[in-house]
Amino acid sequence: MAGKLLNKLLDEQKQASSGARLFDLNKQPPAENWVLNIGGKKVGSLGNFITISGLPKARKTVFAHAMIASAISGSTCLGLSMNLPENKRDVVLLDCEQSENSLWNAMQRAKQMGKWERFPENMRVWYLRKCSPSENMEILEKECARSKTGLIIIDGLLNFIIDFNNVEESHILVKKLMNLVDTNNVMIVNILHISKSTNFTVGHLGSLCDRYTQSTLEVVKLENGDSELKAKYMRDDENFEPVTIYWNHNIENYSVSPSGSYFEDDNLEDVNHGTYIDRIFASNDEQDYTNLIKRVKLIYGKTETFARKKLIPFLLENRYIDKIEGKYKKFTNPF
């Protein structure tokens, strides 16, 4: 199976090589059709692929699904803004890793993000967990060839290759992706793991993706349990401000963390403390002083001294929290 796939890709590469041409310096190419923006920065366009990298369980998939929700709804989701042209509105997810139940639950969250009553007809989700690399590639080729396809998410790209440390195989796969996006004018989002030992995308495949991708984004799990999306490599624009998300128990879905996590000592009154308080007491509606300090420190992103001397007294004084018999709770207005 591996040999057949490699031979097929080699044959295609030989055929594609005949497409070499001199670049016309007197003819300006069509303008880039930018479809993914983050914080006003240009991240991804049709005819290119981008990469989302990160350690396992860092929530790479959550951000990818937010792209789907944004592309279909036309609104910003988790800080990501997708804008597909009218003739390229179809969105495709190739999920190679999740179980059926995990995929179902993730799609329900995407549905909630996009505020859809039902899943739209221009969205197609493939369950490819049991498929071989050659079978995965066949589905990808068919979806790219559909004239209305604008966005394809590959979760994850390692399932399109036998050996991600094989230089030749990795090179052929990346060149194949470049040919598919260019020929069919689609944008592909690859999800790739980062190696725990090197902190780089895995193998020769990861190195080549970083080299040829339009943008590489990295998802990092923070100490307080939040996840941060940041720019690692940006070819066509400056880095965007990192986007941080957290699990919002109030809506049973992910939300963008409020701005001002690292505010200065003198502007406590300008902060949306209510959101922070909800998160501090999300898992336990009653805290002792030691645990309260830990939670305040993590959620606000401040030092323990600042939490103890400034923040907690401020929250008590302004009735964001209440102290009853040595325990701390969210303040509840009796009226």
Predicted feature descriptions by range:
Residues 65, 69, 73, 134-145, ...:
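Amphipathic, non-transmembrane alpha-helical secondary structure
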Residues 51-52, 57, 171-255:
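Phosphate-binding/switch region of NTP-binding enzymes
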Residues 66-67, 102-110, 139, 172-176, ...:
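Alpha-helical scaffold elements adjacent to nucleotide-binding pockets in ATP/GTP-utilizing enzyme cores
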Residues 3-9, 145-146, 222-335:
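C-terminal regions of RecA-like/P-loop NTPase motor modules
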Residues 85-169:
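Conserved inter-motif catalytic segment of the P-loop NTP-binding fold
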Residues 44, 83-87, 116-119, 144-146, ...:
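Conserved catalytic network of the ASCE P-loop NTPase/AAA+ motor domain
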Residues 30-37, 134-135, 197-200:
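Short gly/ser/thr-rich secondary-structure transition/capping motifs
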Residues 7-109, 333-335:
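The Walker A/P-loop phosphate-binding site
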